Amino acid sequence: MKTEELSDREILDIVRPLAEHTENAWNEKCYSDFVRYFLDEDPAEHFPEEEFNRQIEENYDIYGKHTIADLVAIHRNPDHVIVLWKVDLEKRAEPGLLIYGFRKHNGQILIEGCSYHA
């Protein structure tokens, strides 16, 4: 993903819908939607549905739904971009942190990795 000529707004216009889709899939507890935009050609190999369900079971009751909030930073690399957002957590007053990596693959921008820290 060549980002040199893109503004922060242009980058966010491309990647935020992917992150929002993924967070909504987490909120709906839907594995297939969660991994839909992952770069990994076989997400089940590196992030199997069992691991998704384990994380839901461990964390959902504690934090509830995720809502992407304020932008923290955009880190540009020559071939990919990392975006950090605050994430509002339904069951906690303090926000968490979302970290998403995005990369262009076969003409499409996809999620290289994502995590949240609460």
Set out the residue ranges of the language-model regions.
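Short, low-complexity N-terminal intrinsically disordered segments enriched in polar/charged residues
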Residues: 1-28
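Surface-exposed, charged secondary-structure patches
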Residues: 54-101, 113-117
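Short, charge-rich amphipathic alpha-helical segments embedded
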Residues: 43-55
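Short, well-ordered alpha-helical segments enriched in acidic and aromatic residues
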Residues: 27-41
